[in-house]
Regions:
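Single conserved hydrophobic/aromatic residue that forms the stacking wall/gate
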Residues: 1-10
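Acidic-residue sensor for enzyme active/binding pockets
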Residues: 2, 19, 123-124
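Mid-sequence acidic-hydrophobic segments that form the walls
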Residues: 7-8, 26-30
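Conserved glycine-bearing catalytic or ligand-binding loops at nucleotide- and phosphate-handling centers
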Residues: 14-28
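Thiamine diphosphate
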Residues: 30, 34-184
């Protein structure tokens, strides 16, 4: 959470093996401090083999007009699972992968806020000072919209297996589905 306060430090959180590879290549040639957040779990591939990382630019993975899920890192796969469940119920949500948290892609966030009017952020991190806070700040200052944050609620975490911790802290596709339904 306090990491976003560091000046000139660039923050990235890849969602799969291909994005991790592209980000590491970018970081290797970066002049200045970088922070790359990696999870412990193996995750399914989200990006195609010809994916090219673009510094500071989020990626729209699924289109939708009812709500937007903005996510990062290992929560991308969980968010895509939620998107599929919602789609089966006739709810069309946009899913955006913000692999670069600092600097944040204000353009993709504001486009989503203007087009869907409702945002759910999902992160495997403290919502205070993390992705949810950064997205909320962009929206509040430029295009006020409803934002709900899913993540760790400013408490000390526990140790354990990632799957158990995700369930403990509500970092599940079912929680995302419930949150989206509560705001549309």
């Amino acid at each position: 959470s306090e990491w976003l306060e560091f000046r000139r430090v660039l923050f990235r959180s890849p969602c799969d093996e291909k994005e991790t590879e592209e980000i590491i290549k970018y970081v290797a040639n970066c002049d200045g401090p970088c922070y790359v957040r990696l999870g412990r779990l193996a995750v399914d591939s989200v990006n195609s083999s010809n994916y090219k990382f673009e510094f500071g630019k989020g990626v729209t993975l699924r289109e939708g007009n009812d709500c937007t899920i903005i996510t990062t890192g290992s929560m991308v796969q969980v968010s895509l699972e939620a998107q599929q469940k919602l789609k089966a119920e006739g709810i069309n949500v946009r899913v955006i992968n913000l692999h670069t948290i600092k600097p944040i892609d204000t353009e993709i966030i504001l486009k989503a806020a203007k087009e869907t009017g409702k945002i759910v952020t999902v992160e495997e991190h403290n919502v205070v000072g993390g992705l949810g806070s950064a997205v909320s700040e962009v929206i509040c200052e430029n295009h006020p919209s409803l934002v709900k944050k899913i993540g760790i609620n400013d408490i000390f975490g526990q140790s354990g297996k990632p799957e158990e911790l995700f369930k403990e802290y509500g970092l599940t596709s079912d929680k995302i589905v419930k949150t989206v339904k509560s705001i549309i």
